[in-house]
């Protein structure tokens, strides 16, 4: 593939769409600063001691204004950073340009092909002859996946000389992963093994990536220590819930200018993301239907006044479909053919397999009309009616808008900073086994406390007698690990 790494005048590598947007990106990064108190507090607390000085951190996470602030927090604490996006549509090009010019190696642009996406991931992991990164910040697990698959292939190659066969799978993305590894074996048959040996650990941002990590210790395939950032309360109950409540209608209105009030909206899944999406649609005046497999989540939905029904029973009545499940094959092409004309179909789960895009793209005679980037009308030949699909079935809030606002991302990214510090500081202590960990409750409460001042909130203080009465320390933590917020 004819992509070339470029370099700044200082020698830092990058590949972005347009470096002339760097000044614009810098202005928006400065604007975000006021809305990210947790990251600012992290810089103030840890900056003087440079706790990750010398650490090489590879990050696979949406390249946005908000993540730009995370990058510059990590570099302010002493780290070197190489960055790629975890989604082909989510990069904000002005943010990428500003960071590439000023702070870190960036390989990301909006509208990457899948081949370009995996090239960027490979570049972010490439730290030269010294091996790979010391730490990874991952979102969805793609950087983690590439290393694990690379090590597996290198072990097979060393044992019996076999190389990966990209034609062995029908999954287009996995074909590209196997192709990268196959080419790597020609130049360095121990490339990913050396990465594994250097790596301290990974902090994983999202539900989908965390699910993958929890499977690995059971089958013995986990190669390095992971911290599950997603299940910190100050991530999942804020980013996933309130972030989606903000960014779903933003993406819908930017992409389609649709009036949500009076429409029928279906939200597939009623976890934290689904709850935020359903609340957004209800608050905007839509009648909301939920599909759900879990009876507890379904009961929660009914208590919020929502209907819980089968997709098949209402598919022809719904105006707006939103998938939030993290699963696959939720809305299939047969469902789409039964939808009303110009029904909107979108996804806010991490990957693009909740909506059957392959079935839609290969449906005989279907016609794709691109209205604007990431907004396509697909017309079926037998009915001459169509549906509107956003962001090609990928994350619509980042593909069609700018994702979650800075404040709620400050909560998530403060957890990421703390997780990276914990991994690095405890790298030789033997504190952690090779299994998935969640940050302790007192750190979760600390992240929340750092964000209260922005709203002028004041915390009531327990007396010693009160604390003893409910069996908690005066300074917290105030809830047990199993408490459900």
UniProtKB/Swiss-Prot annotation:
MF (Gene Ontology): adenosylhomocysteinase activity
Function statement: Adenosylhomocysteine is a competitive inhibitor of S-adenosyl-L-methionine-dependent methyl transferase reactions; therefore adenosylhomocysteinase may play a key role in the control of methylations via regulation of the intracellular concentration of adenosylhomocysteine.
Entry-linked PROSITE patterns: ADOHCYASE_1, ADOHCYASE_2
Family: Belongs to the adenosylhomocysteinase family.
Listed Gene3D superfamilies: Adenosylhomocysteinase-like, NAD(P)-binding Rossmann-like Domain
Entry keywords, A to Z: Hydrolase, NAD, One-carbon metabolism
Protein name: Adenosylhomocysteinase
UniProt cofactor note: Binds 1 NAD(+) per subunit.
